[in-house]
Structures are given as structure tokens and as C-alpha cells.
Amino acid sequence: PMYFLLGNFSLLEICYVSTTLPRMLTNLWTQRRTISLAACAAQMCWILMLGATECFLLAVMAYDRYMAICSPLHYPLVMNYKVCIQLVVGSWIGGIPVQIGQTFQIFSLPFCGSNLINHFFCDIPPIFKLACGNTFVNEVMVYIVAVLFVMVPFLLILVSYGRII
């Protein structure tokens, strides 16, 4: 299972790089730093989904290591192929609906005035700066989702490694 999880981390990093690097290299090569609103939304959505996947995969990996170290005799039974696949698939699809909804909420804001972002890729704070309406509710929702998607896996990792020590 460990190598399967590491393979998923490798795929995740390839996806991260494929999401941001082509546009960045094109912009640097052509000196034309433009991106459509739809492309910006797609890029942001992919970055958010991949970030959620990374957090979940880290928690799954911590659980895998906990089981391997603390219950080595039960490890093959608990972390069998089916369970490993389910945990990884859950990690990959767990954040999709939330992050798509969050991206839709952010890009539903009214935009007026300048349409320039001073950033290498489409990220949430620069997009909020472009919005001309009240972004408070959206910002609170972003922070709530960020806390949930980062803190819950972090606490699971902490508990797993705490039990190992």
C-alpha cells in the first residue's frame, strides 16, 4: 500500500505542475500575460481540488504507517487492496463537490474595474481583490473550507503519529 500511495502522490504532483506550469511558461515566453475568466476559474478549481486531495492522501498515508507500525500482524487484513483503493479514491473525489461549489461561488461575484491580477496563477486572494461587491461571506466560506480540509487531516495525522510514538 505504501508504494501505491507514493504513486498517487507522484500523480498528484504531475497534476499540480500540469495545472499551473503550462500557462506560466506561455506567459513568460510570449510576454502576453492574459487568461480568460473561464480558464482562470478552471485553473483555480483544479488547484483547490488537488490541494484537498493532497491533504486527504497525507492523512491516509499516516493511517497506513500507523497500521504498519502499531499492528503489523493485522496490517495485511486491515489495509488490503480493496480498502487501500477505497481510501485513495475517497481522497481523490472527496473534495471535488466542495471545491467546485467554492469556485462557482467565487466566480459568481460581480467583477468591475480592473481585471488584472498580480499573481503567477489564478488564486483566491487576487480574485477577491478584483470583485467590486462585498466578499466577506465568500472569504468566511473559504476560510471555513480551508480549516476543515487542512485541520481535519492534520489532526488525523497528529493522532496517527502520536499513537506511533
Task: Map each language-model feature to its residues.
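Transmembrane helical core of 7TM receptor-like proteins
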Residues: 1-165
